């Protein structure tokens, strides 16, 4: 009796402490929890709680009275009432207080959904429950399914304290003794509760989870300011309780539906859940089932609806925020009148019905979600949370077709890793990214047993570009081309009839006549024998591609008549782990490809982008594959890096799981010796390839520092990477989102004062180099002559000579900054018919000097007088860093003020967006043609490789930032200009201290310098031996230090070399060291001006 009296006394004391208020009740409960945490006082504290429960256990009304009077209650929550036998009427004993969520229909439905999982789903797993409230679901889950650990997490600190009390209530019996399960563990071994904003506790403690379950708020608080308060256990009861009903804006697109907190929970879950993990969420159906399911699917989840029912809308939850959302959008939420209503009503109607005393319900579903390709999806979200949160609203990883998902998700993961790891544009050879060529060679070796090296593979933007480039390289008098492959060849080649007497024709005049041929091999062979072409380009019929017989017949007949053979296998190469039989590749597995033959393949067979193409050529003749790589460098610049990455990812997926070199390579028969009468490269190609300074690749032993390239390797701003990534994560991009025409019009108007509206045609190209070379072909079609100022980009001059264009040099001099002087231009134009004048500006490449508005006015006036076409190349402009006294161009005003002009006069504006938009590595060229006849001629050269839809989307976004003068983006451009200015000053200082005479420019990414102190000096090192001059110093520096510059042969200016300085910071510093080291090697410790 004394014990009972003492117990009653303790209960009375506890209740007295609770009487004053909810805060007082919480304080009393917290004091009991401290005793429960301490092993010595734990049994007594548990006995006290048992006595309190028994005091009010007589009826439900007694429990309600306790809640009103003492601001808490302890009662039983009945689980699994339908389970028979010894488990019948299993229950949990739970404490509740006013400031935390009280279990009701919402959470009971969630538990029912969890119940629909098989028992094994949680057994021995690490689980987190989000929004655990008083902990009943975490405890029930641990009690029923025996997980390894359950972490109950809640942002409400009072909820966490009460959850711990409830854990002790159910882990210990009324005598305070532990209750052990069949594995000898108690609930205290399996469950822990922590204060946590969603999964922050697990993230901070690096806990990996097998399962995440959550039943969290999905209505925006009608008082947003209330949600901005800091959550503490001393916050008001009303505020803490609101955390259970409402959520704040989370910065997700789902905020508009009240699902922002769920969205954040899902994305946080992706970072901590194991690859095989499962998330289970309670989803109110108010936004509509499609919206709820899309939240998961667009983040890469497969979903299963475990359970759906209707529940009454809680009367204490204000839905006015949903009414407001309907007012501002076309979306309608879904409610029902009472539980029996089957026709949905909108939030506004539901709100009005509730205000009038009606009762409304909404659907409630429990979804089980599992990531598809979890490791890749995790990489994508790691990238997004690293400063790219704004892109997440565009993310769409929902796919109806698994094959599309299996292709696109790995690519997005690769792209995320690439953008994250490469802060600047990596330096890749024009022949194709080395890694991509390795992957192509690896695929051929692993799947088709052909021992290729990356050098054997040359990458092109498209198959049509590869065919046209090859024909320009050889410039045959007659070529036979498969009728399926002629669609993009120049019309002039297909209409020429210069077949008779071709043996006597001048191989250097560039005339190419193409005859269309049927694909069937017997008919093609008959044509080859009769016409004896110098080049044959063909594909193969499907039935003939199965065996190698047709290919061998083509090899033999082309060898016999002295023809080069380019065989297209685009339709027969399968990017599959089980590719079908291919006769051409079977042949190559056993025999070396003869020197007169090459394989072409256009890659368009992907599951996602039908218009995304990359092509490659395979040759085992060193002279041919080297010449092809140099041809693409001159005529195209390079192939889109992103396109190579896309197909590279496909090849990687096919190779990543294989054990390398598992099978010994079979011996191949050597290639047959080909007779000498085989056509060689055209005379203009031979002389150009010999004289041009091409890209110098590095080796495994030593890397090259490139100060000889027209590319920027400065850090790529996050705004650019975000736009690139968004262009791929989006689905169903509209035409208006990729239409850059108006944006380019605005750019040229703002930058150069040119109005490109009306009849002007804007044509896009992968690079400005490719567009320039189409203009060269237009000039040749008009039988015109290209006029280049002395000091023009050496590759442009070489490209014109490669295709045998007629060229004239306009003299320039250092005193005028290598600008064209009007009088000199006029004197030159007097002696030229049909002139095309090339002007690079406002920034001149490679000198870095600027043309002012008055300069361009005078030049255009002279050109108008002589009826010249003018190609203004703005590709290297937009990065002017010394503009004091310089006046921006006003081309529209200039053109309208011309007093006289010949009818043949017109202006073509050539441009490249990557420099002006700080998007190094992502090229986008454009040309604006105001002359309709010229536009028609341009279109006749239809092999132009155009930017993919994703690039158009990227540059549309970047142009929007620039044209709208976005402050952050404008600051980035200013920073890049300042960086270039600092680099230029440092380079000038280094050059002048090392015996060079620098020509100091005002913009761009390069400058000229004269090796004054080195002229005539004898030098011998690493394979170089001779007297130094401005034309051979490139080779000497390269061999001695690994630094590559352009010599005077490239600049065209006697005595002047070119240094490009938009390098990655570390590379730039190494380059400065190389310049100093070369001075030491040649001049020793001699003091120079500026030293």
Swiss-Prot record:
The keyword Cytoplasm applies. One of its GO terms (cellular component) is cytoplasm. GO terms for biological process: biosynthetic process; methylation. It comes from the Eukaryota. Its EC number is 2.1.1.12. InterPro entries: Aminotransferase_I/II_large (IPR004839), Met_S-MeTrfase (IPR025779), PyrdxlP-dep_Trfase (IPR015424), PyrdxlP-dep_Trfase_major (IPR015421), SAM-dependent_MTases_sf (IPR029063), Small_mtfrase_dom (IPR007848). The keyword Lipid biosynthesis does not apply. GO terms for molecular function: methionine S-methyltransferase activity; pyridoxal phosphate binding. It catalyses: L-methionine + S-adenosyl-L-methionine = S-methyl-L-methionine + S-adenosyl-L-homocysteine. Pfam families: Aminotran_1_2, MTS. It is found in: Cytoplasm. Keywords: Cytoplasm, Methyltransferase, S-adenosyl-L-methionine, Transferase. Homotetramer. Belongs to the class I-like SAM-binding methyltransferase superfamily. Catalyzes the S-methylmethionine (SMM) biosynthesis from adenosyl-L-homocysteine (AdoMet) and methionine. SMM biosynthesis (by MMT1) and degradation (by HMT-1, HMT-2 and HMT-3) constitute the SMM cycle in plants, which is probably required to achieve short term control of AdoMet level. Also able to catalyze the selenium-methylmethionine (SeMM) from AdoMet and selenium-methionine (SeMet). May play a role in phoem sulfur transport; such function is however not essential. This is Methionine S-methyltransferase.
């Amino acid at each position: 009796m004394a014990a009972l009296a003492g117990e009653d006394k303790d209960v009375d004391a506890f209740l007295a402490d609770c009487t004053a208020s909810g805060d007082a009740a919480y304080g009393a409960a917290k004091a009991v929890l401290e005793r429960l945490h301490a092993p010595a006082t734990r049994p007594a504290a548990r006995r006290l709680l048992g006595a309190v429960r028994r005091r009010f256990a007589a009826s439900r009304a007694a429990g309600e009275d306790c809640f009103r009077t003492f601001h808490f209650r302890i009662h039983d929550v009945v689980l699994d009432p339908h389970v028979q036998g010894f488990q019948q009427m299993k229950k949990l004993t739970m404490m509740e207080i006013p400031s935390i969520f009280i279990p009701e229909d919402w959470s009971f439905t969630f538990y029912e959904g969890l119940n629909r999982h098989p028992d094994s789903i949680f057994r021995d797993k690490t689980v987190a429950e989000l929004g655990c409230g008083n902990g009943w679901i975490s405890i029930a889950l641990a009690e029923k399914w025996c997980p390894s650990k359950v972490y109950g997490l809640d942002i409400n600190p009072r909820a966490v304290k009460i959850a711990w009390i409830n854990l002790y209530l159910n882990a210990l019996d009324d005598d305070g003794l532990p209750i052990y399960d069949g594995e000898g563990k108690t609930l205290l071994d399996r469950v822990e509760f922590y204060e946590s904003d969603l999964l922050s506790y697990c993230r901070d403690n690096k806990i990996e989870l097998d399962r995440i379950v959550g039943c969290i708020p999905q209505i925006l608080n009608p008082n947003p300011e209330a949600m901005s308060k800091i959550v503490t256990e001393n916050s008001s009861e009303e505020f803490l309780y609101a955390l259970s009903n409402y959520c704040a804006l989370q910065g997700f697109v789902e905020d508009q539906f009240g699902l922002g907190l769920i969205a954040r929970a899902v994305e946080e879950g992706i970072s901590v859940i194991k690859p095989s993990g499962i998330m289970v969420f309670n989803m109110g159906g108010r936004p509509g089932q499609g919206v709820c399911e899309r939240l998961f699917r667009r983040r890469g989840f497969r979903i299963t609806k475990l359970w759906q029912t209707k529940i009454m809308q809680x009367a204490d939850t204000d839905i006015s925020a949903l009414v407001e959302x309907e007012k501002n959008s076309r979306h309608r939420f879904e409610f029902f009148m009472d539980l029996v209503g089957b026709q949905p009503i909108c939030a506004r109607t539901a709100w009005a019905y509730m205000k009038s005393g009606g009762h409304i319900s909404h659907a409630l579903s429990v979804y089980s979600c599992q990531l598809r390709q979890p490791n890749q999806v995790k990489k994508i979200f790691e990238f997004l949370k690293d400063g790219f949160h704004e892109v997440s609203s565009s993310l769409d990883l929902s796919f109806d077709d698994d094959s599309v998902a299996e292709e696109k998700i790995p690519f997005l993961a690769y792209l995320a890793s690439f953008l994250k790891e490469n802060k600047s544009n990596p330096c890749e050879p024009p022949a194709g990214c080395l890694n991509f060529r390795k992957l192509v060679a690896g695929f051929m070796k692993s799947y088709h047993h052909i021992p290729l090296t990356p050098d054997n593979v040359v990458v092109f933007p498209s198959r049509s570009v590869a065919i046209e480039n090859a024909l320009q390289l050889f410039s045959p008098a007659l070529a036979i081309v498969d009728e399926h492959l002629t669609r993009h060849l120049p019309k002039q080649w297909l209409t020429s009839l210069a077949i008779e007497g071709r043996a006597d024709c001048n191989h250097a005049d560039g005339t190419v006549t193409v005859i269309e041929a049927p694909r069937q091999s017997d008919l093609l062979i008959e044509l080859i024998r009769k016409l004896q072409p110098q080049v044959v380009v063909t594909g193969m019929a499907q039935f003939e591609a199965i065996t190698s017989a047709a290919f061998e017949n083509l090899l033999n007949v082309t060898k016999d008549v002295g023809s080069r053979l380019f065989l297209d296998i685009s339709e027969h190469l399968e990017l599959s782990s089980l590719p079908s039989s291919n006769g051409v590749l079977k042949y190559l597995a056993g025999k070396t490809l003869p020197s007169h033959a090459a394989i072409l393949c256009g890659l368009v067979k992907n599951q996602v982008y039908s218009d995304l193409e990359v092509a490659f050529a395979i040759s085992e003749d060193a002279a041919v594959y080297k010449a092809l790589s140099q041809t693409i460098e001159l005529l195209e610049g390079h192939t889109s890096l992103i396109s190579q990455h896309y197909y590279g990812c496909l090849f990687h997926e096919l190779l990543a799981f294989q054990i390398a070199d598992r099978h010994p390579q079979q011996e191949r028969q050597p290639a047959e010796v080909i007779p000498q009468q085989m056509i060689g490269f055209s005379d203009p190609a031979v002389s150009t390839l010999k004289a041009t300074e091409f890209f110098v690749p590095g080796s495994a032993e030593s890397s090259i520092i490139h100060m000889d390239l027209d590319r920027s390797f400065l850090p790529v701003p996050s705004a650019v990477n975000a736009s690139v990534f968004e262009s791929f994560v989006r689905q169903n991009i509209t035409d208006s989102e990729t239409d850059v025409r108006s944006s380019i019009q605005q750019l040229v108007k703002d930058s150069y004062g040119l109005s490109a509206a009306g009849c002007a045609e804007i044509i896009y190209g992968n690079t400005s180099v490719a567009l320039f070379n189409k203009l060269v072909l237009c000039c040749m079609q008009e039988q015109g002559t290209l006029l280049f100022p002395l000091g023009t980009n050496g590759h442009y001059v070489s490209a014109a000579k490669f295709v045998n264009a007629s060229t004239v040099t306009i003299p320039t001099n250092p005193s005028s900054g290598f600008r064209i002087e009007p009088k000199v231009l006029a004197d030159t134009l007097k002696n030229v018919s049909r002139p095309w004048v090339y002007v690079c500006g406002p920034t001149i490449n490679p000198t870095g000097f600027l043309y002012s508005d008055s300069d361009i006015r005078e030049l255009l006036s002279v050109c108008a007088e002589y009826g010249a076409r003018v190609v203004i190349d703005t590709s290297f402009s937009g990065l002017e860093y010394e503009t004091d006294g310089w006046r921006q161009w006003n081309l529209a005003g200039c053109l309208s003020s011309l007093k006289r002009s010949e009818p043949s006069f017109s202006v073509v504006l050539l441009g490249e967006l990557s420099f002006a938009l700080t998007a190094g590595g992502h090229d986008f060229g454009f040309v604006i043609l105001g002359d309709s006849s010229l536009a028609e001629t341009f279109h006749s050269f239809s092999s132009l490789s155009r930017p993919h839809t994703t690039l158009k989307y990227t540059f549309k976004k970047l142009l929007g930032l620039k044209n709208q003068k976005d402050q952050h983006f404008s600051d980035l451009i200013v920073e890049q200009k300042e960086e270039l200015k600092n680099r230029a000053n440092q380079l000038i200082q280094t050059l002048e201290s090392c015996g060079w005479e620098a020509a100091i420019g005002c913009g761009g990414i390069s400058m000229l310098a004269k090796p004054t102190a080195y002229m005539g000096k004898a030098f011998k090192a690493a394979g170089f031996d001779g007297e130094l001059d401005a034309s051979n110093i490139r080779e000497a520096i390269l061999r001695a230090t690994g630094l590559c510059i352009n010599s005077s042969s490239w600049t065209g200016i006697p005595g002047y070399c070119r240094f490009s300085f938009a390098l990655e910071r570390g590379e730039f510093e190494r380059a400065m060291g190389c310049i100093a080291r070369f001075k030491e090697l040649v001049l020793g410790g001699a003091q120079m001006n500026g030293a």
